[in-house]
Amino acid sequence: MRAEVGKASGRTGTANGNLALATAAFALTFWAWNLVAPLSRTYTEHLDLSPARTSLLVAVPVLVGSLGRIPVGALTDRYGGRVMFTAVGLVSIVPTFLVGVSGDSYGMLLLWGFFLGIAGTSFAVGIPFVSAWFEPGRRGFATGVFGAGMGGTALSAFLTPLLVERLGLFTTHLLMCAALAAVSALMWAFSRDAPDWRPRTGAALPRMREAVRLKATWQASLLYAVAFGGFVAFSTYLPTLLTTAYDFAQTDAGMRTAGFAIAAVAARPVGGVLSDRIGPVRVCLASFLGTCVFAIVLALHPPAEFPAGLSFVLIAISLGLGTGGVFALVAKLVEPSRVGTVTGLVGAAGGLGGYFPPLLMGAVYQATGEYTLGFVLLAAVSVAVALYTSRAFRQT
């Protein structure tokens, strides 16, 4: 009996250590993924960009980071999280450096921003990696804590403009390259795949077909496109929105975007824990209904600090709860050997959900001079997905 307790305790310690490493790696790669958006005003003024071109610039890394999760998730099922975290971190160094030397060319920023999206694929590595370390009843907690690595976007929103202001664009990107190299080395040296994890052999395409045939994949993809897509869209476009709609300075907009991201990040593990206790469906319903309510408030273009500032924080909390709830649902509905591939597909849907809103918001603002229509559409989509969730998961 004592031996069994000791073994369980040791595994828990190892699980927590790997969870901490994975969360740190996720945060740093997400910071790299979000290097362009906090500097949108700088690029806009320096290169004389229209709102539509600025929106495209901040959205391109999101697109690649989203679609790239599909093959990366499948590769994680085959090679494991230790190998894939190390690989994603090291490969991301190249575009991080090249974006840092391309500030004078819109075309080169688009090109290297495209490849910077690779950093955003780390999400599809981490979910199966940490899920394998925990028993089913604790996977909501594990994926929620790992999801707190989304705080990398908060770090980027707050620190990137300050670092560029004090050190310059090139030095800031060079520091990020060093950080990516360091976290990749740490993952390779100290992380381990779970003892129960086994690589899935065979071609990746058949495994993707299997995942696509699962009803749970499509259901979770829809929910995540709204929850995580909303978070990504706000994280990438909020600096632009605050500087155009409320005339904040770039550093002030960055601080407020960081506050938004911190609220969402803090809410994600809460969503995971609540999912373990009251069920992921209820958590997702609360998320989507809350998003709808606060989007309506923002559509009225209220004063900047109150109620707009409070509404941005509350919508961040709502979206954060939803991101934790969706992957608790995935862990509940999908067998562990398929979680990596399914995570890649669901993560891609979430990222794509964050790709189109910045483009839409830029077009709406260019046409009307305000963002009302964009917030109305967010409210409508949120309530529609809430209705779908209540009907599709009645027995879950």
Predicted regions and their residues:
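Helix-loop-helix hairpin linking two adjacent transmembrane segments in secondary transporters
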Residues: 145-191
